[in-house]
């Protein structure tokens, strides 16, 4: 998560060109911060599933139970190696772009005892990223949201809260084993 920390120092060095130009810069930064966060989440999940038999089995069961009968038959014919590759490929293609998905994934894969995103506003910033990336920050009434340096700083702060919570749990789990 060093990339996100770099945003904080970069923000201190931005020149105030003008509100419109700054808002464009801040939109890019918010999208980047949350995209890095989502990639970090995916990397943690993939690493855990690929290195821990219990996590792989938990995730595989969840995936298998959600499949149609036809897809289950395809999975039943796969070797263990093929299943592992397929599950990891599915994880790489999976989107971690909502707080509920992140919470459920960490419960399934890490046996995280509570909602990893609770006590944070990360969901707000994930939605903000979606609004910026897919709608250019346009609201339903046709106007555009304007973003400020505080929005970027808050996005960084909220991602750091979740990352710290996750890393503390992982560190404690490793030390108790």
Annotate the PLM regions.
Residues 1-31:
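Charged alpha-helical initiation segments
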Residues 119-131, 145-177:
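Amphipathic, Lys/Arg-enriched alpha-helical patches that create a basic surface
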Residues 12-20, 109-113, 139:
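Short, charged/polar, low-complexity loop and linker segments
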């Amino acid at each position: 998560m060093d990339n996100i920390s770099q945003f904080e120092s970069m923000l201190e060095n931005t020149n105030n060109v003008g509100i419109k130009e700054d808002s464009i810069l801040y939109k890019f930064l918010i999208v980047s911060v949350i995209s890095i966060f989502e990639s970090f989440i995916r990397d943690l999940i993939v690493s855990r599933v690929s290195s821990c038999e219990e996590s792989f089995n938990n995730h595989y069961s969840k995936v298998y139970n959600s499949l149609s009968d036809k897809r289950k038959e395809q999975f039943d014919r796969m070797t263990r190696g093929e299943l592992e590759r397929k599950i990891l490929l599915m994880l790489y293609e999976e989107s971690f772009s909502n707080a509920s998905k992140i919470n459920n994934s960490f419960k399934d894969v890490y046996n995280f005892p509570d909602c990893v995103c609770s006590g944070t506003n990360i969901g707000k910033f994930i939605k903000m990223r979606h609004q910026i990336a897919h709608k250019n920050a346009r609201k339903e009434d046709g106007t555009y949201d304007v973003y400020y340096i505080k929005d970027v700083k808050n996005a960084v702060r909220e991602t750091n809260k979740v990352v710290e919570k996750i890393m503390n749990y992982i560190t404690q789990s490793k030390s108790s084993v």
